[in-house]
Amino acid sequence: MRRALLLVFGILLAAVADAQTSEVDLFRQLTPQHDMDSIEMKTLYLDVDALAFFKDNEFDGNIAKGYTLPGARLTPHLTYRPRPELSLELGLSALMYHGTNRYPNYAFHDIVTWKGGAYQGGAHLLPYFRATAQLGAATFVLGDLYGTAHHGLILPLYKPENLLTTDPEKGFQTLIRTRRWKMDAWIDWQSFIYEMDKHQEAFTVGMTQSVELLRPKAHGWALELPVQLMVQHRGGEQDDTDLGVQTLCNGSIGLQLRKTWNHRVLNAAEVEMHTLGAYQQAGKLWPFNTGAALW
């Protein structure tokens, strides 16, 4: 009986972990990936990234409210590669929800608060521009970033569902890929302010990197060391608010161990663990200044 209970517990634990991983993997597959090599030189392409979605979140309790996200995101854009190391993209990004034709006319950081007055009709529209330069193992991106689930952030640091609610990340990004090291560093400028503005400047700085400590050879074992960091800043010197500077830091370091087999049923197993830390460098958004956790 004890063995049966342990087996059931193990299956349930694996199911919960697999459900979380499946959601992350799903949003990662839905996110456009960086692949300059697939673009022919001096050829003009018309691409349309289209995503239709219906996501229902039902919660029981007082911690979070339930909500439903029915809609679509469209990004039609032209792509041109004038040189082997350079590609340019220009287009439009549109976010639409079923059941409404009015969208608040300001930056979307999550499910936005309706303020009335200033709004767009039909869809939440934004210009789309991306310049990508590839120099050896490094790739530099200016404009619309390869963002959201593309960064590979773990769930405690980033909610993949943001792909359905937030504006595309815009700013500057550096991607590095070597034989044993992968890095993604970026700054996402979320809110620009004018002189005497009524809201704060907002941007997020992030970094993910992974070092391959053990490569899967004949033994099938792979070991990686992932390090991740997110810094969110709210402030500015031109705004007309009394909120002060707000700076929140979250980071993690972990280990990922993977074993592969040549088997029809069980061909891979993976376990990972991360140590997380939080630090409120400035402001009073959190009721505490530091924190730590395991995931």
Place the predicted regions along the sequence by residue:
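Exposed, low-structure sequence patches enriched in small/polar residues
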Residues: R3, D49-F53, G71, Y128, ...
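Outer-membrane beta-barrel translocator domains and adjoining extracellular loop/strand segments
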Residues: N57-I63, T100-A107, G152-K159, E195-A202, ...
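Short loop/turn motifs that connect adjacent beta-strands in outer-membrane beta-barrel proteins
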Residues: T21-S22, R28-L44, Y80-L88, A137, ...
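Surface-exposed coil loops of outer-membrane beta-barrel proteins
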Residues: T139-S210
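Beta-barrel outer-membrane channel/assembly domains of diderm bacteria
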Residues: Q20-G121, P127-A133
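Cleavable N-terminal export/targeting peptides
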Residues: M1-Q33
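Short, glycine/acidic-rich beta->alpha junctions
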Residues: P70, G121-A123, T166, E201, ...
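Transmembrane beta-strands of outer-membrane beta-barrel pores
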Residues: A50-D56, L92-H98, L135-A137, D144-A149, ...
